């Protein structure tokens, strides 16, 4: 498995990027899911956002566990960078699907 300069391997990074793109493309279904739990939060959008990020993060951790890899600080920081680099896409997708 080829490793990028720090953190997440190239293969795992590609997998996570593709997974995140999938969830962005499915934002409408997460908005619908959030409608079911709207009574627990003032913002259904925040619920949908949290579900997307939480699901991708859970998959990130499970991928490492399946490969018997230790999650290191560099890996977590790179994961957070991946999410930060896609915040606008996630937000835009959630906003588009609520109109």
Predicted regions and their residues:
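Charged, amphipathic alpha-helical oligomerization/scaffolding segments
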Residues: 22, 55, 82-85
């Amino acid at each position: 498995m080829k490793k990028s300069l720090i953190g997440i391997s190239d293969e795992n990074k590609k997998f996570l990027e593709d997974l995140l793109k999938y969830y962005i493309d499915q934002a409408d279904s997460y908005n619908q899911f959030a409608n079911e739990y709207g009574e627990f939060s003032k913002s259904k959008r925040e619920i949908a956002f949290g579900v997307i990020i939480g699901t991708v993060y859970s998959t990130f951790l499970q991928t490492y566990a399946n490969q018997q890899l230790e999650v290191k600080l560099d890996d977590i920081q790179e994961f957070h960078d991946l999410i930060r680099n896609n915040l606008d896409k996630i937000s835009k997708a959630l906003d588009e699907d609520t109109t």
